[in-house]
């Protein structure tokens, strides 16, 4: 209902002429009804909380958030086109400029990530930190929820997609942490076992920073 263009059809208001007054040209005023703006605000108000409240618990949830962002940008762009074509050109132009700038910044950022990690995954996943693992057969890129350059293999794996399962189970030659402004090679420093599962901690090579194992690993473990 909020997406219907009929809500944004301008209303034409004509000046009434009284019987005793001389006839004169009617003054026509065109305006978009309030329901159109209310519908647009309601849609945006519903999408933005959904965009920021969905968790990053899995790759599927992140893809859903990215699709919601695309739908929101498309909705606002179509709305701005409708406003520009009708009578609300200042409002429509401002909204269109906002949408174009937002889409340009998003596209540049995502294309840069695609070139950096040599994968199209950033186009459908809005996260900005990735782990790339290379094996003899090839490489796999998985997005991660944290921004620190470390990785714990086969531990607390929430996502069960093919790429995440491979990265947490395969034996690989190289592990790289890729963020927006850096690319860091990770090396294994410690192994531990928990509930019969063997996990490996990867940190940057020659790193002087301490690794908070109390955050990424439980307090009771066997090293």
From Swiss-Prot:
Claim: Membrane is one of the keywords in the record: yes
Protein's cellular compartments: Host membrane
TM regions (residue ranges): 32-52, 63-83, 88-108
CDD domains tied to this protein: MERS-CoV-like_ORF5
Superkingdom, taxonomy of origin: Viruses
CoV 3a-like viroporin TM domain residues: 22-125
Membrane topology annotation: Multi-pass membrane protein
Alphabetized UniProt keyword annotations: Host membrane, Membrane, Transmembrane, Transmembrane helix
The protein's name: Non-structural protein 3d
Signal peptide residue numbers: none
One CC-aspect GO term: membrane
Disulfide bonds: none
InterPro entries reported in the protein's UniProt record: a/bCoV_VIROPORIN_3A-like_CD (IPR046446), a/bCoV_VIROPORIN_3A-like_TM (IPR046445), MERS-CoV-like_ORF5 (IPR044323)
């Amino acid at each position: 209902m909020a997406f219907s263009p009929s809500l944004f059809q301008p209303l034409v208001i004509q000046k009434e002429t009284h019987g005793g007054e001389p006839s004169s040209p009617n003054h026509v005023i065109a305006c978009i009804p309030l329901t159109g703006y209310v519908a647009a605000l309601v849609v945006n108000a519903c999408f933005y909380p959904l965009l920021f409240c969905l968790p990053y618990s899995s790759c599927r949830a992140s893809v859903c958030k990215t699709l919601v962002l695309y739908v929101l940008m498309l909705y606002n762009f179509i709305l701005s086109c409708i406003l520009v074509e009708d009578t609300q050109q200042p409002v429509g132009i401002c909204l269109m400029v906002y949408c174009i700038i937002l889409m340009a910044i998003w596209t540049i950022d995502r294309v840069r990530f695609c070139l950096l990690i040599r994968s199209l995954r950033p186009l459908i996943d809005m996260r900005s930190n990735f782990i790339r693992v290379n094996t003899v057969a090839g490489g796999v890129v998985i997005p991660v929820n944290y921004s620190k350059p470390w990785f714990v293999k086969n531990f607390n794996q929430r996502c069960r997609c093919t790429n995440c399962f491979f990265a947490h189970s395969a034996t690989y030659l190289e592990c790289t942490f890729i963020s927006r402004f850096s690319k860091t090679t990770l090396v294994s420093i410690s192994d531990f076992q928990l509930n019969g599962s063997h996990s490996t901690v990867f940190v940057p090579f020659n790193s002087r920073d301490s690794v908070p194992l109390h955050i990424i690993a439980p307090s009771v473990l066997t090293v």
